[in-house]
UniProtKB/Swiss-Prot annotation:
It catalyses: N-acetyl-L-glutamate 5-semialdehyde + phosphate + NADP(+) = N-acetyl-L-glutamyl 5-phosphate + NADPH + H(+). GO terms for cellular component: cytoplasm. It comes from Geobacter metallireducens (strain ATCC 53774 / DSM 7210 / GS-15). GO terms for molecular function: N-acetyl-gamma-glutamyl-phosphate reductase activity; NAD binding; NADP+ binding. The active site is at residue 149. The gene is argC. Transmembrane segments: none annotated. NCBIfam families: argC (TIGR01850). This is N-acetyl-gamma-glutamyl-phosphate reductase. It is found in: Cytoplasm. GO terms for biological process: L-arginine biosynthetic process. Its EC number is 1.2.1.38. Catalyzes the NADPH-dependent reduction of N-acetyl-5-glutamyl phosphate to yield N-acetyl-L-glutamate 5-semialdehyde. Belongs to the NAGSA dehydrogenase family. Type 1 subfamily. It holds the Pfam family Semialdhyde_dhC_1.
Length: 346
């Protein structure tokens, strides 16, 4: 049995981790921390976990956490993670970090979009945790930087086209829509019910969203050269889910049937990527609560552009589910273990 800790469990990602880990037959959750709710029972903070988690939330004391767990999930905000991750590693613990702190290859990029990185030594050793790209490296990693939700949906949507050199990389436009849980659980006026209900708005417009450098880093590695994209996120009045519509000019085949066949072959054997038949596009309703990424394709013959639509649950494949998938790879468990639940519908 693998003993794990969830650090920063009072947010949406934290509770999603607890939900998924409860169903994992090889895992025991031995420590759960929350600075905001320390001293309160887990079920008092998250009634959905009542009668399943009897622990009391603890303060974050890194040495004590490390004494209780072999693997530590850090579900903390950026900067807060890199304040504790070095201690966990020094004490011989493996870490899956769900913040942005260990996703980048270059600390200068992190500094440009966030702030100066306090732990560049471990940043260099961290493995970007998108299993469909880095499965082998994840298996040997001591520190995995779990990908962001938007990057997961965009990278998986574009990977076959870039690897097969079928698009002009300079023409990529990604238009993504997210449920409100993507903004976190903290109280913010702009996320109140009356602010988001019956509304649909863009944000981070003009190339300023912090997920842009993460997307560009991974797409550039796939393409073998620097890529700059146009990316605009939107907030939609639903709890969870991300739908990304991605456009690029084709340089190869414009047959939808051939592109669908290419994607199906490329992702053959990937347990969580589902390529839809030609003429079908995904819906967030069909991946809700699951670790799936659904992908559909179309071609606009008038403009010579391919349209890729990808759907994920931002809290599962976009966060906690992917973290559990990475844990499975790190410890040699079946990759789907604890993640085999079907999407919730309706």
């Amino acid at each position: 049995m693998l003993n794990v800790a969830v650090v920063g469990a009072s947010g949406y990602t934290g509770v999603e981790l607890l939900r998924l880990l409860y169903c994992h037959p090889e895992v025991a959750v031995t420590c759960i921390t929350s600075e905001q709710s320390a001293g309160r029972p887990v079920a008092a903070v998250f009634p959905t976990l009542r009668s399943r988690y009897t622990q009391v939330l603890e303060n974050l004391e890194p040495v004590k956490v490390a004494q209780k767990a072999d693997l530590i999930f850090t579900a903390l905000p950026h900067k807060a993670a890199m304040e504790v991750v070095p201690t966990f590693l020094e004490l011989g613990k493996r870490v899956v970090d769900l913040s942005a702190d260990y996703r980048f290859n270059d600390p200068a990029v992190y500094e440009k979009w966030y702030e100066p990185h306090m732990n560049p030594e471990n940043l260099k050793e961290a493995v970007y945790g998108l299993p469909e790209i880095r499965r082998e490296k994840i298996g040997d990693a001591w520190l995995v930087g779990n990908p962001g939700c938007y990057p997961t949906s965009v990278i998986l949507g574009l990977m076959p086209l870039l690897k097969k050199r079928l698009i002009d990389p300079s023409t990529i436009i990604a238009d993504s829509k997210s449920g409100v849980s993507g903004a976190g659980r903290g109280a913010k006026v702009e996320n109140l019910y009356c602010e988001v209900n019956d509304g649909f708005k863009a944000y981070g417009v003009g190339g300023v969203h912090r997920h842009i450098p993460e997307i560009e880093q991974e797409l550039s590695l796939l393409a073998g050269g620097p890529i700059t994209i146009t990316f605009t996120p939107h907030l939609v009045p639903m709890d969870r889910g991300i739908l990304s519509t991605i456009y690029a000019r084709l340089t190869g085949t414009d047959s939808v049937a051939e592109l669908v066949k290419l994607y199906a072959e490329f992702y053959e054997g990937e347990p969580f990527v589902r390529v839809l038949p030609a003429g079908n596009v995904p819906s967030t309703a069909h991946v809700r609560g699951s670790n799936f990424c659904d992908i559909g394709l179309a071609v606009d013959s008038r403009t010579g552009r391919v349209i890729v639509v990808s759907a994920i649950d931002n809290l599962v494949k976009g966060a906690a589910g992917q973290a559990v998938q990475n844990m499975n790879i790190m410890y040699g468990f079946p990759e789907t273990m604890g993640l085999e639940g079907l999407p919730l519908f309706p």
